[in-house]
Structures are given as structure tokens and as C-alpha cells.
From Swiss-Prot:
One of its GO terms (biological process) is wax biosynthetic process. Its EC number is 2.3.1.199. Residues 114-403 form the FAE domain. GO terms for molecular function: fatty acid elongase activity. Keywords: Acyltransferase, Endoplasmic reticulum, Membrane, NAD, NADP, Transferase, Transmembrane, Transmembrane helix. Pathway: Lipid metabolism; fatty acid biosynthesis. It is found in: Endoplasmic reticulum membrane. InterPro entries: 3-ktacl-CoA_syn, ACP_syn_III_C, FAE1_typ3_polyketide_synth, Thiolase-like. It holds the Pfam family ACP_syn_III_C. CDD domains: CHS_like. Induction: Repressed by herbicides such as flufenacet and benfuresate. Down-regulated by darkness and low temperature, and up-regulated by salt, drought and osmotic stress. Inhibited by K3 herbicides such as alachlor, allidochlor, anilofos, cafenstrole, fentrazamide and flufenacet. Strongly inhibited by metazachlor and mefluidide. This is 3-ketoacyl-CoA synthase 1. It comes from Arabidopsis thaliana (Mouse-ear cress).
Length: 528
């Protein structure tokens, strides 16, 4: 019977934890865990990663275009193998003018073709994260007091929120918008717009100031906000406020969850490839005011406990002259979408509870769903970034188990050999714990994510940029360093972006950094 229970717990991805209250009593908690991200992968995702890691232009150039053009050159000039041998052994042999001219034209044509078709670099010039005014700060105790005094919650759900808040990993200096902290709460369109304007304009003002770029110079604008989509759109709000140019290409992404920030980066990357000599601005945020839940469905109350106010603005460029002043270049973006599966699609779902109150429900399967999406994303990304030795060891282990059905211990690639820094979406303490365990990361690697969760809470799609800002504020970014951003959110989606530092980022570059004035207080000890 004990063996059967163990199998069932493993199948359902459950973990038992025991805590002792006193000498005579103990508490056993059962919670879901992420799947082992690297021991159960599919060859099709490895194949996808290998395919994406190969540059099509380079392959065509060396395998088709270069040999074909060389053959044509030989036919046109009458060069033979004997002529090449004579040229090699006897430097006195001279080529006629027509042959020299043909060779020169050939080399110029091939070089021009290669340069014209190779991938254009996209630079991250700089970014800014919004830091609300001190009046918007709220401690864990203040949040719980506000929750209890509101009158919308039962005693059971108040206690539930207290348990979650004490274990979530948030500190006492996160931020909530005025509409929620007002007595009584003012959850209306006016307050929601005020929150959106404060966050977006605050981040953009800082970005334009630190980069010296004028709003009129921006040719592409992308805004992502999952749960607040007014008319006119948030992107139109920005265009109007900064009086941007009339031919600006603006996009407003809604409903795409916490992973939408990297979707915006990917969209900007593709648009910059099609629009030379351009600047693109990405604004990632979430709006809390109209999405606070005043019901008693526990699956919807989780969002109240972890989501907080925040946003970020990012400036991208494809102008080669901007390389010297830019901080990073974009190396890879990998997007994984599991929405074809009903369980994945429904695990984060906005709906009405039994009393008609709207909220966002987080299903019990969220941990396993996130793990599966992350596993697929990592398997696809691996061949693009891992050293060849790690790829070979991983593939050999995978083939032995999948094709030959051998019972061998799976080889877990060391992603620390591919990246110096990790920015993992600060969605919650439990997810960070499991990702650290499965990727075998040190506390130092997880520090930006854990400290961001503690200082700012879950700011949705912008959390990755608070983490990058933390890494910079600590003076850890050196030229050539590789940084991995991992985001996951509703749909269910998991997205990765890989950046390479073009220069060291000095701790003196703290203008617009949300950690300015408090970075020396971190890291702090957080709930484990």
C-alpha cells in the first residue's frame, strides 16, 4: 500500500512537507511541484532548437550559392585545375585582365549578397522601470488589515490570504494603486486610467531622459497590458501624451498574461528587421485597479496576495551607430504556446465566481502546467545556447532513453555554462524554488528574481526588467555576459529571451534604476 501511494503522489506531482508545532504535534502539507524539467523531453523540441540555431542564409551561402557561382566563374573565364596549380607553384604566371575583372566582380557579388541577407542586429539601448511614490507603499500587515476591514471577505478567506501572504515572499515595500487603498476602494475607469498613466509615463519619462531620445524619433511603439484595455488604447494614450509622429507603427497587446513582455520584444525584433534605421519602444505593465477581486473564491484570491503595481519601458534600435551606447544585443527569442491543450488553456482564466464577481482564477494544476511549458521551452532553447559538449552529452542520453529504451540516468545540461545571469519571472516563491532546483542554480543566480519579488511583488510582464535592473545595480554585468530572461503566463505560454552585454554596466549608471537608493540593503533573507 505504501508503494502504491508513492506512485500516485509521483504521478500527480505532489510533495509532502512536515513541520513540527511542538513536541507532541506535527503538520503535514501536500503541495504540487513542478515536473522534472529536463528528464522528460521530446525529440521534436530538440529538433526544433537545432533547426532554429542554424542560420539559413549561411547554410544557403556555403552549400549552394558559393559552389554554384564558382562553377559559373570557371565556365566564363576558362580557368582549369591546371591553371590553379600553376598559379600556386609559379607566382610569375599572370591572369589576363578579363579573368581578374571577373574574379573581382564575383567576390564583390558574393560578399554583397551575404552582407545583405545576414541577420541584422537589434540592440537594447536602455530601459527604465517605474518606481511609484512612497505613498503607494503597502506592507504585508497593512495589506492584511485592509483586507480584513474591507468587509467583503469571510473569516476563512481572510485567514487564507494571511497564510498565502506570509509565505509568498513579498516584503513590506511593494506598491498598490490609490484606487485600491482608498477607503472605500475606488475601482472605476478614472482611477484605472490614472494608474496606467502614472506607470507608463513615469517609465517613459525616465527612459527618454536617460537615453536622450526624443519621442518623435520613435518609429515603433508596442504596449502590453493583459487585463486593462480601454478605448482609445494604451498605445494611443502614449502617442497622444508625447505627441508622437503620425506614421508611427503602434501595437497594443492585451490578454496575453505575464509572458507578454517577451512577446512584445519578439514583435519589436521582427518589425525592426523590416524597418531599417528605426527606434522601437516597448512598454510592459499590468493594471491592478479594475482587477482587484472582492469575492471569496480562493483560486481568485491568490492574485490579490501577489500582484502589485509596476511597469517598464525598453528602447530597442537597429541603427549600427547605436551599438556603442547600447547595453545589450538580442541573441535569441524562443516562444512556447501550450494553448491547444484544454488544461493549459484553462489554468489561468478570467471569469465570474458563483456570485458574479469577476476575478482571475489560478488552477491547482498551474505548477505542473508551468513546468511542462518551461520544459518544452528549455529543450528548444538548449541547442541554440549550450556548449557543444553539453549538447552532445544531453542528446546521447536522450537517444539512449527515447530510442533504445535504455534505463540510464538522464543527463541534465548545465545552463550555467551558457549564461552568467538569470532573470526568471517573479511569479511566486514556490515556482522560483522549483525552477532553481530543476536547473541546479545557486542562490546567487536566483537573487535578482527573489529580491524583485520581495521588493516589488509580482509586477507581471515587467518583473523581468526589475530583475535585470537589480543585476545592473549590483555591478554584475560585464562585457560579453549572457543573460537569460524566462517568462511564463496565461495561455499557457513560456517565452525566453537571450541578451549579450555589449559593454560593462557601471553602478554609476543608476539614473532611472528602480533600485537606486535601496540596492545596498539587498539581498535580504526571504521566506523559504
Amino acid at each position: 500500500m505504501e508503494r502504491t501511494n508513492s506512485i500516485e503522489m509521483d504521478r500527480e506531482r505532489l510533495t509532502a512537507e512536515m513541520a513540527f508545532r511542538d513536541s507532541s504535534s506535527a503538520v503535514i502539507r501536500i503541495r504540487r511541484r513542478l515536473p522534472d524539467l529536463l528528464t522528460s523531453v521530446k525529440l521534436k523540441y530538440v529538433k526544433l532548437g537545432l533547426h532554429n540555431s542554424c542560420n539559413v542564409t549561411t547554410i544557403l551561402f556555403f552549400l549552394i550559392i558559393l559552389p554554384l557561382t564558382g562553377t559559373v566563374l570557371v565556365q566564363l573565364t576558362g580557368l582549369t585545375f591546371d591553371t590553379f596549380s600553376e598559379l600556386w607553384s609559379n607566382q610569375a604566371v599572370q591572369l589576363d585582365t578579363a579573368t581578374r575583372l571577373t574574379c573581382l566582380v564575383f567576390l564583390s557579388f558574393v560578399l554583397t549578397l551575404y552582407v545583405a541577407n545576414r541577420s541584422k542586429p537589434v540592440y537594447l539601448v536602455d530601459f527604465s522601470c517605474y518606481k511609484p511614490e512612497d505613498e503607494r507603499k503597502i506592507s504585508v500587515d497593512s495589506f492584511l488589515t485592509m483586507t480584513e476591514e474591507n468587509g467583503s471577505f469571510t473569516d476563512d478567506t481572510v485567514q487564507f490570504q494571511q497564510r498565502i501572504s506570509n509565505r509568498a515572499g513579498l516584503g513590506d515595500e511593494t506598491y498598490l494603486p490609490r484606487g485600491i487603498t482608498s477607503t472605500p476602494p475606488k475601482l472605476n475607469m478614472s482611477e484605472a486610467r490614472a494608474e496606467a498613466e502614472a506607470v507608463m509615463f513615469g517609465a517613459l519619462d525616465s527612459l527618454f531622459e536617460k537615453t536622450g531620445i526624443k519621442p518623435a524619433e520613435v518609429g515603433i511603439l508596442i504596449v502590453n497590458c493583459s487585463l486593462f484595455n480601454p478605448t482609445p488604447s494604451l498605445s494611443a494614450m502614449i502617442v497622444n501624451h508625447y505627441k508622437m509622429r503620425e506614421d508611427i507603427k503602434s501595437y497594443n497587446l492585451g490578454g496575453m498574461g505575464c509572458s507578454a513582455g517577451l512577446i512584445s520584444i519578439d514583435l519589436a525584433n521582427n518589425l525592426l528587421k523590416a524597418n531599417p534605421n528605426s527606434y522601437a519602444v516597448v512598454v510592459s505593465t499590468e493594471n491592478i485597479t479594475l482587477n482587484w477581486y472582492f469575492g471569496n473564491d480562493r483560486s481568485m484570491l491568490l492574485c490579490n496576495c501577489i500582484f502589485r503595481m509596476g511597469g517598464a519601458a525598453i528602447l530597442l534600435s537597429n541603427r549600427r551607430q547605436d551599438r556603442k551606447k547600447s547595453k545589450y544585443s538580442l541573441v535569441n527569442v524562443v516562444r512556447t504556446h501550450k494553448g491547444s491543450d484544454d488544461k493549459n488553456y484553462n489554468c489561468v482564466y478570467q471569469k465570474e465566481d458563483e456570485r458574479g464577481t469577476i476575478g482571475v482564477s489560478l488552477a491547482r494544476e498551474l505548477m505542473s502546467v508551468a513546468g511542462d511549458a518551461l520544459k518544452t521551452n528549455i529543450t528548444t532553447l538548449g541547442p541554440m545556447v549550450l556548449p557543444l559538449s553539453e549538447q552532445l552529452m544531453f542528446l546521447i542520453s536522450l537517444v539512449k532513453r527515447k530510442m533504445f529504451k535504455l534505463k540510464v540516468k538522464p543527463y541534465i545540461p548545465d545552463f550555467k555554462l551558457a549564461f552568467e545571469h538569470f532573470c526568471i519571472h517573479a511569479g511566486g516563491r514556490a515556482v522560483l524554488d522549483e525552477v532553481q532546483k530543476n536547473l541546479d542554480l545557486k542562490d546567487w543566480h536566483m537573487e535578482p528574481s527573489r529580491m524583485t519579488l520581495h521588493r516589488f511583488g509580482n509586477t507581471s510582464s515587467s518583473s523581468l526588467w526589475y530583475e535585470m535592473a537589480y543585476t545592473e545595480a549590483k555591478g554584475r554585468v560585464k562585457a560579453g555576459d549572457r543573460l537569460w530572461q524566462i517568462a511564463f503566463g496565461s495561455g499557457f505560454k513560456c517565452n525566453s529571451a537571450v541578451w549579450k552585454a555589449l559593454r560593462p554596466v557601471s553602478t554609476e549608471e543608476m539614473t532611472g534604476n528602480a533600485w537606486a537608493g535601496s540596492i545596498d540593503q539587498y539581498p535580504v533573507k526571504v521566506v523559504q
